[in-house]
From Swiss-Prot:
CDD domains: Lumazine_synthase-I. It is an enzyme of class 2 (transferase). (2S)-2-hydroxy-3-oxobutyl phosphate binds at E85, T86, R127. This is 6,7-dimethyl-8-ribityllumazine synthase. Keywords: Riboflavin biosynthesis, Transferase. GO terms for molecular function: 6,7-dimethyl-8-ribityllumazine synthase activity. The active site is at H88. It catalyses: (2S)-2-hydroxy-3-oxobutyl phosphate + 5-amino-6-(D-ribitylamino)uracil = 6,7-dimethyl-8-(1-D-ribityl)lumazine + phosphate + 2 H2O + H(+). It comes from Thermococcus gammatolerans (strain DSM 15229 / JCM 11827 / EJ3). Belongs to the DMRL synthase family. InterPro entries: LS, LS/RS, LS/RS_sf. One of its GO terms (cellular component) is riboflavin synthase complex. Catalyzes the formation of 6,7-dimethyl-8-ribityllumazine by condensation of 5-amino-6-(D-ribitylamino)uracil with 3,4-dihydroxy-2-butanone 4-phosphate. This is the penultimate step in the biosynthesis of riboflavin.
Length: 154
């Protein structure tokens, strides 16, 4: 029996990346963006376009526009949703997750869900720079998926 395993790598040379980032909760999203850009630079990505949107809820529409453009090998969606006293947190978090997944499925372009959902700002800071930077990790997923899709087309 012959088994062929296909995996994506982390070499960014020749890849074009799109990033859509929410301005709301910018103390957190700004750090996620820094982490993502650091990752892309360290892995040789030469072309990155960053588009800023008002909040996380607006991410799927812009991610779709970017994915449909044919310009990007992957799109990274960055945002931060912090729980408040109302159900707004659950509604936004769920709809953004569904929207991002649908964009990826509808376009065939990897769209990475890089929206942190946290109970409070301290938890957010722990995910966006103090203990680790999820932006870097999400960018790694974008690299891997872009390379995987390229390999699957060979």
């Amino acid at each position: 029996m012959e088994v062929r395993t296909v995996e994506g790598g982390f070499i960014g040379k020749g890849l074009r990346m799109g990033v859509v980032v929410a301005r709301f909760n910018d103390l957190l999203t700004g750090e996620l963006l820094k982490g993502a850009l650091d990752c892309f630079e360290r892995h040789g990505v030469e072309e990155v376009d960053v588009v800023k949107v008002p909040g996380s809820f607006e991410i799927p529409l812009v991610a779709k526009k970017m994915a449909e453009s044919g310009r990007y090998d992957a799109v990274l969606a960055l945002g931060a949703v912090v729980r408040g006293e109302t159900k707004h947190f659950d509604l936004v978090a769920n709809e953004v997750a569904k929207g991002v997944a649908n964009v990826s499925l509808d376009t065939g372009v990897p769209v990475i869900f890089g929206v942190i959902t946290v109970e409070d700002e301290l938890q957010g800071f722990n995910r966006a720079g103090v203990k680790s930077n999820k932006g870097f990790e999400y960018a790694m997923a974008a690299l891997e998926m872009a390379d995987l899709m390229r390999k699957m087309e060979e």
